């Protein structure tokens, strides 16, 4: 496994890379090990005819042992507001898609636009995009975080939907709800900020953070000003959602005035996001989790591969032609066709606790990862259209599952996702 580690700086000076013994995990010293992968049943049903086909993202979470909830897509009616429950099949080593097992669908697709009677709110510009899911084993609930795909007028009203019994998605539901924060400085845009994934916290952090879990939505979305310009985190207690509970404390968020990229580049304007290694126009945090037995909050996604700088012209383009003459339609893309790479950002929960205790002295934009670098995902090699748009941590097995757009080619076309599994050496659950 080839990981490229960047040193990082924070306001108090250089951060020395820590080892597991100090309470922090290091991907540089213990790289993730590629274990193989699996696919999910790609066909749809009446609620989502396209199923896993054409799905440009895949928000997901593990439920009961051997089960996973994953979003799908239907281009005709509501886009990325669909999801279903699947079996996790036996993992097959290697990258031969024809050899991989298919996980059968065990509960049919649900459409949050329909399930929660969003009606005229779910217009084309208001289509709900699932940003994260969380199965709460203590309550049996399935939490679905979502945001409006395009919200140029910042009128998003809802971002959270609760299926009271995850094993019976057709049953009782609570919502639509707005999970927001009073201390994030952007109350009119909180729906976009917090329509994502809920993350369990170790019990020792509950008091310090004022919640039992974290919530984050650091996906790359349209209209950057309504998102965090870097990873984000707020504390929350899921059992209170639906009865007035919201974000207890904003712990990490980056604004346009204080982006994560500013920690390594003082350039002004948008040019910084063309080549910045911490955060740029390609940066995307697909999922996050606390690495068991450590104080490490890990974000995983994709980024621009700065190892290609020696070629020259290693930058990001918008609706342009890449090195192979392919047109990057309607989005940002790397100039080099193999310029996308898996990426991770590791943060110290002790730093976030400083913000929880004194947000004036330690603003939520004051954090930098103590380590970040690359995860080389074999199926992404050389293909600029493949990237990590989804994933989750399997708390039953201690493995990361990365969802790679178009990874199932050539067995399936139409952007069918592949699910790539990585072991974390030394991590036990």
Q: Which positions does each model-derived feature cover?
A:
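Enriched but not universal
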Residues: 1-21, 427-429
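Beta-strand-rich domains and repeat architectures in extracellular enzymes and scaffolds
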Residues: 35-77
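Structural signature of eukaryotic scaffold interfaces centered on beta-propeller domains
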Residues: 50-65, 115-143, 149-151, 185-219, ...
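Blade-loop segments of beta-propeller domains
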Residues: 56, 80-135
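Short glycine/acidic-enriched loop and turn motifs that connect beta-strands
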Residues: 74-79, 149-153, 304-307, 407-411
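Beta-propeller blade signature
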Residues: 80-99, 154-180, 224-259, 315-353, ...
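Loop/turn-rich, solvent-exposed surfaces of beta-rich toroidal or solenoidal domains
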Residues: 276-384, 391
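Blade-level signature of beta-propeller repeat domains, shared across WD40, Kelch, NHL, RCC1
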Residues: 387-429
């Amino acid at each position: 496994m080839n990981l490229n580690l960047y040193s990082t700086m924070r306001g108090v000076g250089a951060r020395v890379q820590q080892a597991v013994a100090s309470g922090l995990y290091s991907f540089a010293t213990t790289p993730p090990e590629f274990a193989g992968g699996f696919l999910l049943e790609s066909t749809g049903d009446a609620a989502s005819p396209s199923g896993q086909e054409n799905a440009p993202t895949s928000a997901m979470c593990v439920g009961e042992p051997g089960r996973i909830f994953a979003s799908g897509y239907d281009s005709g009616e509501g886009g990325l507001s669909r999801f279903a429950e699947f079996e996790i099949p036996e993992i097959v080593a290697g990258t031969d898609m024809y050899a991989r097992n298919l996980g059968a669908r065990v509960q049919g697709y649900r459409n949050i636009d329909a399930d929660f009677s969003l009606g005229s709110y779910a217009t084309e510009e208001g289509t709900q995009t699932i940003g994260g899911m969380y199965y709460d084993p203590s309550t049996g609930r399935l939490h679905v975080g979502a945001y409006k795909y395009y919200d140029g007028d910042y009128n998003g009203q809802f971002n959270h939907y609760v299926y009271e019994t995850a094993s019976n998605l057709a049953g009782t539901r609570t919502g639509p709800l707005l999970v927001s924060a009073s201390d994030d400085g952007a109350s009119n845009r909180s729906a976009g900020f917090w329509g994502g994934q809920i993350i369990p916290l170790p019990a020792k952090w509950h008091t310090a953070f004022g919640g039992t879990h974290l919530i984050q939505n650091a996906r790359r979305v349209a209209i950057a000003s309504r998102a965090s310009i870097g990873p984000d985190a707020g504390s929350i207690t899921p059992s209170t959602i639906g009865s007035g509970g919201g974000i207890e404390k904003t712990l990490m968020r980056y604004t346009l005035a204080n982006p994560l990229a500013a920690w390594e580049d003082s350039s002004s304007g948008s040019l910084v996001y063309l080549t910045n290694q911490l955060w740029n126009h390609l940066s995307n945090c697909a999922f996050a989790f606390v690495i068991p037995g450590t104080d490490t909050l890990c974000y995983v996604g994709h980024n621009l591969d700065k190892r290609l700088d020696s070629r020259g012209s290693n930058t990001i383009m918008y609706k342009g032609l890449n090195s192979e003459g392919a047109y990057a339609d309607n989005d940002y893309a790397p100039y080099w066709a193999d310029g996308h790479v898996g990426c991770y950002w590791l943060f110290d929960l002790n730093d976030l606790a400083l913000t929880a205790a004194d947000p004036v002295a330690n603003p939520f934009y004051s954090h930098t990862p103590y380590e970040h670098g690359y995860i080389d995902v074999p199926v992404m090699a050389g293909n600029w259209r493949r990237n990590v748009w989804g994933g989750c941590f399997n708390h039953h097995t201690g493995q990361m599952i990365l969802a790679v757009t178009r990874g199932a080619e050539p067995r399936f076309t139409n952007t069918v996702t592949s699910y790539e599994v990585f072991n974390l050496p030394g991590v036990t659950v």
